[in-house]
């Protein structure tokens, strides 16, 4: 018995020591990678910069090493954000060591507005006289193709396909599933177009929601088709005809029509690159990733300039509290804006917003700080793929708002959502509860019972008051009457093109254009950029986020496409109170 206990304790001690050792090793490896990432890099002559499209490209490069870790293979796959990609394209244009760019097309969407910014930046790079080639090993997606129309040549692998068919917007509905589970979603809303709640109370699109989706998806596709037509020298009518006929499954037809330049194997692609770059036949090509090129120092970067422009990145859902790198915390972003406002060296602010919205109170907190900041120094909003509902709310007080024609914005409307899981818990799972109250509504709101008529009335009043505040904020920021904003509001979602026509956006442009606009408003000839929120200390971040980052990767890996449904249903449970969110999970593909 004694020997058994000794052996058991030894095994337990061994497991604990192994776990500690593994943690220390992982911490050392990750810290080493993070430290190495700060060292300047050098590249060889006649290098080719690689731009990977068809991947999830965040607005800002994630400085968290855990985001680069694949928990299954324990390998690191660093990826650059849009901010660094745009810097790299500008830098590469004048870098004598960069001969050209290869666009490697993948399968994941990064967002149409992001694609538009990349395409514009590539066209500017092209003015340097250097080559741009585009290649797809597998399936060329429409979004990647749109970016690739800035290239000198677009090639496909002979066995690959081009998924060219026009845009579709798909909405997933949970009403019947929730009813079967015994969950009632109680909704209080303002705005006939507020489609964010429809997946929980309907089993198909309302006429109003179908109308608005058709309009903004049609606007985005119209812009894309026009750009394709101009770049490839193919009429708009012919482009539409090719999309209608699913011609992407016949590469020869696409080549003949002029949408692509042909099909070649990778060795033939590399021969073409060698020829364009002046590299000897058979010699290895030095391909440079965006992540590596970000570490190459830029000449004349303005690093010594005293005046600064702060670029604040706000990406994800708007939530109460501090938030994290995947969302926008009301408290933390209010603090960032206060800090930027008080810093006298910062002469202007670019507020990059890429959000479908979120908590109404958190949105109002951020808006207030933007308004106060705009009274002290110029604030320019740069809208990404989305700046809708709460995303528009936090943008409204800026001096200027820039967006892509492909940005999805507007959705000026609010709603309240309270799940009632009484049937699920009581009838299906046998879980009941009892409550002792000091007042009539001490347990309000509760997922254990339905709302009373009075409680619904209180929530409706709160929603109406919040909507009035929202339209007032927009009216003040955009110089409109509140009645005019109401006519544009009601939860209506707009494309960037239509938002500009409606006066919700000042002009078209991406992040680079917003920075130039901010410099112009602040009358700055020389300046340097500082990015906010500031990077968190690596050790604090590792300890705080290790479990969360790995958990999210495991969920995404195991559920794949279905992971979005998991997060959507999870949000139902967490979303209490008044929300300002656009229709959720509308896939445009």
Functional labels for PLM-detected ranges:
Residues 40, 49-171, 301-424:
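Cleft-lining beta-strand/loop regions that shape enzyme active-site pockets
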Residues 304-309, 313-345, 462, 533-589:
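Intrinsic disorder and flexible/low-complexity segments
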Residues 175-274, 422-502, 506-507, 512-517, ...:
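Charged, glycine-interspersed solvent-exposed loop segments at helix/strand-loop junctions
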Residues 313-316, 353-355, 383-385, 398, ...:
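Active-site proximal loops enriched in glycine and acidic residues that flank catalytic Cys/His/Asp
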Residues 2-42, 46:
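N-terminal type II signal-anchor transmembrane helix
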Residues 360-365, 498-501, 543-545:
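Short glycine/threonine-rich loop-to-helix capping motif typified by GTGT followed
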């Amino acid at each position: 018995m004694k020997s058994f206990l000794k052996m058991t304790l030894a095994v337990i001690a061994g497991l604990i020591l192994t776990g500690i050792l593994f943690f220390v090793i992982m911490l050392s490896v990750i810290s080493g990678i993070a430290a190495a990432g700060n060292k300047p890099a050098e590249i060889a002559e006649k290098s080719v910069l690689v731009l990977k499209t068809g991947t999830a490209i965040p607005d800002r490069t994630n400085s968290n090493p855990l985001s680069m870790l694949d928990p299954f293979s324990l390998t690191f796959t660093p990826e650059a954000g849009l901010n660094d990609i745009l810097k790299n394209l500008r830098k590469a244009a004048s870098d004598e060591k960069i001969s050209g760019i290869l666009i490697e097309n993948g399968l994941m969407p990064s967002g149409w507005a992001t694609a538009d910014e990349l395409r514009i930046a590539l066209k500017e790079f092209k003015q340097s006289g250097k080559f741009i080639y585009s290649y797809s090993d597998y399936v060329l997606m429409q979004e990647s193709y749109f970016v690739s129309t800035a290239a000198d040549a677009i090639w496909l692998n002979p066995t690959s396909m081009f998924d060219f068919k026009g845009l579709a917007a798909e909405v997933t509905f949970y009403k019947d599933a929730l009813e079967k589970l015994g969950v009632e979603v109680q909704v209080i809303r303002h705005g006939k177009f507020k489609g964010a709640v429809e997946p929980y109370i309907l089993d198909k699109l309302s006429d109003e929601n179908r109308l608005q989706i058709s309009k903004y998806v049609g606007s985005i596709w119209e812009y894309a088709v026009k750009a394709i037509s101009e770049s490839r020298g193919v009429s708009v009518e012919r482009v539409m005809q090719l999309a209608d006929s699913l011609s992407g499954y016949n590469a020869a037809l696409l080549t003949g029509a002029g949408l692509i330049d042909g099909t070649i194997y990778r060795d033939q692609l590399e021969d073409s690159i060698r020829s364009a770059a002046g590299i000897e036949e058979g010699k290895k090509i030095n391909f440079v990733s965006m992540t590596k090129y970000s570490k190459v120092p830029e000449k004349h970067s303005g690093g010594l300039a005293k005046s600064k422009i702060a670029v604040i990145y706000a990406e994800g859902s708007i939530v109460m509290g501090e938030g994290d790198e995947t969302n926008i915390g009301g408290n933390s972003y209010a603090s960032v804006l206060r800090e930027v406002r008080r810093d006298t060296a910062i002469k202007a602010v670019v507020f990059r917003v890429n959000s479908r919205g979120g908590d109404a109170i958190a949105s109002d907190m951020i808006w207030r700080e933007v308004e106060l900041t705009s009274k002290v120094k110029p604030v320019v909003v740069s809208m990404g793929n989305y700046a809708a509902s709460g995303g528009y709310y936090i943008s409204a007080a800026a001096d200027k708002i820039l967006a892509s024609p492909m940005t999805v914005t507007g959705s000026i409307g609010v709603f309240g959502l309270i799940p009632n899981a009484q049937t699920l818990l009581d009838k299906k799972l046998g879980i009941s509860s009892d409550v002792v109250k000091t007042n009539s509504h001490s347990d309000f709101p509760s997922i254990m019972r339905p709302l009373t008529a009075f409680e619904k009335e209180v929530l409706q009043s709160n929603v109406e008051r919040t909507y009035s505040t929202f339209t007032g904020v927009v009216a003040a920021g955009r110089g409109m009457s509140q009645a005019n904003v109401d006519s544009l509001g009601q939860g209506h979602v707009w494309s960037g093109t239509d938002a500009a026509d409606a006066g919700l956006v000042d002009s078209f442009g991406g992040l680079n254009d917003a920075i130039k606009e901010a410099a112009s408003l602040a009358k700055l000839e020389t300046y340097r950029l500082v990015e906010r929120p500031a990077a968190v200390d690596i050790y604090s971040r590792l300890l705080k986020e290790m479990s969360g980052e790995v958990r999210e990767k495991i969920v995404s890996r195991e559920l794949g496409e279905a992971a979005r449904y998991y997060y959507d249903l999870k949000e139902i449970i967490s979303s209490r109170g008044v929300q300002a969110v656009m229709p959720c999970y509308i896939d445009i593909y």
